[in-house]
From Swiss-Prot:
ATP binds at residues 194-197. CDD domains: RfaE_like. PROSITE patterns: PFKB_KINASES_1 (PS00583). Pathway: Nucleotide-sugar biosynthesis; ADP-L-glycero-beta-D-manno-heptose biosynthesis; ADP-L-glycero-beta-D-manno-heptose from D-glycero-beta-D-manno-heptose 7-phosphate: step 1/4; Nucleotide-sugar biosynthesis; ADP-L-glycero-beta-D-manno-heptose biosynthesis; ADP-L-glycero-beta-D-manno-heptose from D-glycero-beta-D-manno-heptose 7-phosphate: step 3/4. In the N-terminal section; belongs to the carbohydrate kinase PfkB family. It catalyses: D-glycero-beta-D-manno-heptose 7-phosphate + ATP = D-glycero-beta-D-manno-heptose 1,7-bisphosphate + ADP + H(+); D-glycero-beta-D-manno-heptose 1-phosphate + ATP + H(+) = ADP-D-glycero-beta-D-manno-heptose + diphosphate. GO terms for molecular function: ATP binding; heptose 7-phosphate kinase activity; heptose-1-phosphate adenylyltransferase activity; phosphotransferase activity, alcohol group as acceptor. InterPro entries: Bifunc_HldE, Carboh/pur_kinase_PfkB_CS, Cyt_trans-like, PfkB_dom, RfaE_dom_I, RfaE_dom_II, Ribokinase-like, Rossmann-like_a/b/a_fold. The keyword Glycoprotein does not apply. This is Bifunctional protein HldE. The active site is at 263.
Length: 473
């Protein structure tokens, strides 16, 4: 399946559910308490992040989609912190604030990137379902997807009225379910239980075929449009009536924290479906996003640039021939990993041993090598009639096949100054016997603190000589 970045800016989503505040106390531990055999944490940083349904809305906004949120809080500083964080992220939030009840807070004590303790401050909310339904109905206009983010904390009391209200307007309903009774989600377009939640309803699944059979039966029993079971390190499985099961492997390279991974899945699904993507493509994007977010510590959101870079890697543009936009994204990703970018340029009309040796030497100056290639018109202007021998597409394809080369891009001008000013490599490399100041673009690179290097050419290796020899023979 070919992945592409949706137009999230045209995908408004409404989230309704249990909001909470994820609070982190970070500090160092260097001694054991004299009062009890427990570590003493000297707190030096307090961090608040939206959690639960608020994290779903935050994830949707981080992807660039317009996000609205309806939830229930207390009348306290935790609710104020939530409201401020969401407003800063561009999320429109409407809270039903209840006096004499605390906003749900999950406090985690962290040291050296390890969670030592979690303390929960919560009481089940006594909400007004009619008032909440009225708020939802007023915000459904113009929305393309409704998300029910259910943590079983009391914000969602009348699931069916919300599902039916959205369906009456032709709005898909996605639900992240909770509890032992999934009948409350009857008629939803899609529900996204994890494997444990799914098996609580249908019983233990002995193998994949059993999971599929039980899932299809649940689809029919609850009149669901689709069912997505998230399965941790085994990826996720999408089930639809009359369609083959779609199994997607897990994408995580390293797992640091699974907190909020389910929120990332449903938020990416919702934003992608709202943007007009079909369900298999939306699920593939959600799987990719989940693989990124579990590599982060704590409740975290995935940004649009992160997802775009992941798509580029997935589609094979981590290496090879790129356009300028793809190249700039690849460079951003490389720099995020502290990689040094090397740049060289030329016509590379007939690739020979001298070129290969030179490119290997250039690659050794850093971690990633960009080769910028003159297009056909500029080669003709530089080299004269009859050149190039090979078209720019063929020249770039050959260069992209070399192990020393990471990215290849063409440029139309006679010199690469315009490209250099946008790419801003750490090292500019040129082959020849002239001084550094004579290298075209050296002034641009040196102006922002980059390095310019001149490498010697391999003797008796020349494209011009090869062309002349061919013509004589």
């Amino acid at each position: 399946m070919k992945l592409s970045m949706p137009r999230f800016d045209q995908a408004p989503v409404l989230v309704v559910g249990d909001v909470m505040l994820d609070r982190y106390w970070h500090g160092g531990t260097s001694r054991i308490s004299p009062e009890a055999p427990v570590p003493v944490v000297k707190v030096d940083q307090i961090e608040d992040r939206p959690g639960g349904a608020a994290n779903v809305a935050l994830n949707i906004a981080a992807l660039g989609a317009p996000a609205s949120l309806i939830g229930v809080t207390g009348q306290d500083e935790a609710a104020d912190s939530l409201a401020n964080s969401l407003q800063a992220a561009g999320v429109r939030s409407v809270f039903q604030r209840i006096a004499h009840q605390p906003t749900i807070v999950k406090l985690r004590v962290m040291s050296r990137h390890q969670q030592l303790l979690r303390i929960d401050f919560e009481e089940p909310f006594a909400t007004d379902p009619l008032s909440l339904a009225t708020e939802v109905d007023s915000l459904l206009e113009g929305v393309k997807v409704l998300v029910l983010s259910d943590y079983g904390k009391g914000a969602l009391k009348n699931h069916q009225s919300l599902i039916q209200a959205a369906r009456a307007k032709g709005i898909p309903v996605l639900a992240d379910p909770k509890g032992k009774d999934f009948s409350i989600y009857r008629g939803a377009s899609l529900i996204t239980p994890n494997l444990s939640e799914f098996e609580t309803i249908v019983g233990r699944c002995t193998d994949e075929a059993d999971l599929v059979a039980k899932g299809l039966q649940l689809l029919q029993d609850l009149d669901l449009g689709a069912l997505l079971v998230t399965r941790g390190e085994h990826g996720m499985t999408l089930l639809r009536v009359g369609q083959p099961a779609l199994h997607l492997p897990a994408r995580a390279r390293e797992v640091f924290d699974v907190t909020g991974a389910g929120d990332t899945v449903i938020s990416t699904l919702a934003a992608a479906i709202a943007a007009g993507e079909d369900l298999p493509h939306a699920v593939a994007l959600a799987n990719l996003a989940a693989g990124i977010v579990v590599g982060k510590l704590g409740t975290a959101a995935i940004s649009a640039p992160e997802l775009r870079r992941a798509i580029q890697r997935e589609e094979g543009s981590e290496r090879g021939v790129l356009g300028l936009e793809q190249l700039l994204l690849a460079i951003d990703d490389a720099r995020a990993h502290k990689e040094k970018i090397v740049f060289t340029n030329g016509c590379f009309d007939i690739l020979h041993a001298g070129h290969v040796t030179y490119l290997e030497q250039a690659r050794a100056q850093g971690d990633r090598l960009i080769v910028a290639v003159n297009d056909d018109a500029s080669v003709s202007r530089l080299k004269g009639p009859g050149r190039p021998i090979n078209s720019v597409d063929r020249r770039m394809a050959v260069l992209a096949g070399l192990g020393a080369v990471d990215w290849v891009i063409s440029f139309p001008e006679g010199t690469p100054e315009n490209l250099l000013s946008q790419v801003k490599p750490d090292v500019l490399v040129k082959g020849g016997d002239y001084g550094i100041d004579q290298v075209v673009g050296a002034d641009i690179v040196k102006a922002y603190g980059g390095t310019v290097k001149v490498l010697g050419l391999v003797e008796n290796s020349s494209t011009t000589a090869i062309v002349e020899k061919i013509r004589k023979n």
